[in-house]
């Protein structure tokens, strides 16, 4: 039995290319073992706490090994509960559209919440930063309107580069990427792009969850 946490970053549901490819991955994951479980975190329907003064004060006190106030401790507990939910999975799947060469703001908000000292990373003067989410696979599906891979436009890709940097920072080493591009093209080409990405998702899920 395995638990997959699926983090959905597009609000477009079944109109989203990244979401549709993710569904092919999920179906294959569920076929691998009847006991497998999927938990979906729709970032457009999940209440994320504000990153406000109390939370920031708590964070910096923790970074400096100081005790937070009662209000700061409450804010930190709310954050810690979300991080605990995130870490309570065996593997991960993100579906992400490109917005303005980067990621949707809801996903950035979520990342700012889960990237926490003592919870998903640690720091020491001797060894520097060390990620704490280790030994788990993460698959990221990126949808983008233009062709970025293998073109001059690759320098504008702050979607995949940012996600891989962040995931590596908090400890992931087994990171897999599926790119759905270009989607802003004619209907026939768009369907070919989608079909190719779905097949790639199915093949990867079979490999990760021992269906081959």
Curated annotation (Swiss-Prot):
FMN binds at residues 10, 16-18, 98-101. Its cofactor is FMN. Its EC number is 1.6.5.-, 1.7.1.17. GO terms for molecular function: electron transfer activity; FMN binding; oxidoreductase activity, acting on NAD(P)H as acceptor; oxidoreductase activity, acting on NAD(P)H, quinone or similar compound as acceptor. Homodimer. It comes from Desulfotalea psychrophila (strain LSv54 / DSM 12343). Pfam families: Flavodoxin_2. InterPro entries: Flavodoxin_fold, Flavoprotein-like_sf, FMN-dep_NADH:Q_OxRdtase_AzoR1, NADH:quinone_OxRdtase_FMN_depd. It comes from the Bacteria. It is an enzyme of class 1 (oxidoreductase). It catalyses: 2 a quinone + NADH + H(+) = 2 a 1,4-benzosemiquinone + NAD(+); N,N-dimethyl-1,4-phenylenediamine + anthranilate + 2 NAD(+) = 2-(4-dimethylaminophenyl)diazenylbenzoate + 2 NADH + 2 H(+). Binds 1 FMN per subunit. This is FMN-dependent NADH:quinone oxidoreductase. The keyword Oxidoreductase applies.
